[in-house]
């Protein structure tokens, strides 16, 4: 960062005042400033209680800095540095405590070891299938860094809080829905470390007014990181469903996910193989990503093979329109498979 640009940015930031009339520069919100080739990035400290305030601050910063000569773009990112702040107030109890969610009978995590296997698609359509067989269903989007559930359900806006200070979830066809995506702008990146991810997931799970639910589906992010540890150690999971494609590269990561859940004593309900085959117009199946990969792996790992979901263009199109395929399609092979999977899982849990 050139010294001249740095000085101009700092001077501009000293001008900004918050709604409480205090100067932004005095509130210890700014974590870092970077500038390169006309692009400014401001890192802002965020916690679970000030997300909306920080979002507003980001808008003020962009408005103030975007007119600086030579500046092409201004980006604000949310970050969290637990070692720098509130260390005396953040001494955590080492004992892992399960947070009960009132009035929710069963909680199922939909997980995968690898991204891009269609886990969120499976989550919304499986939840929809449960709804169609008469269950009261909720969906919690636990993918903090890449929430896609709001888009796939066509939901926008910010959630409100009721008189009990509980978050009022959004609804789609009577399904209750909560996601970090409702709290941030679409273009707002989230740069959070473990403690912040942990806090956000727990808050959404336990401080949302879910009402009476038969099943809460938790759409997990890919991998075996902070979000998975938080959900498995702090929420009363009844089991997890692993999603994978038939490809060896996806199956290898699925095995890692299975191993993680077993280590924390979470039952594996079974595995769903997504994009199993492409159904051609003449009725033939084309095994684009291989054949029977998840089925063979389920036998090796001694877990239930739930169903295989075909690669169906209509599923993708429905998600892009913001309507689950299960609700939009009146009948068809893929819909029958999802309903069959829901009934099979319902018997197990």
Give the predicted meaning of each segment:
Residues 321-332:
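C-terminal boundary of histidine-terminating zinc-finger modules
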Residues 54, 58-59, 214-215, 221-318:
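Conserved catalytic-core segment of NTP-binding enzymes
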Residues 1-31:
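N-proximal, solvent-exposed amphipathic alpha-helical segments enriched in charged/polar residues
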Residues 130-192, 198, 205:
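Phosphate-binding loop that captures ATP/GTP phosphates
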Residues 184-231:
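Phosphate-binding/switch loop-helix module in NTP-utilizing enzymes
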Residues 26-29, 36, 46-50, 54-111:
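Extreme N-terminal, non-catalytic leader segments
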Residues 106-144, 258:
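Walker A/P-loop phosphate-binding motif and the immediately C-terminal alpha-helix
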Residues 13, 30, 65, 104, ...:
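Residue-level signature of catalytic and energy-coupling elements of molecular machines
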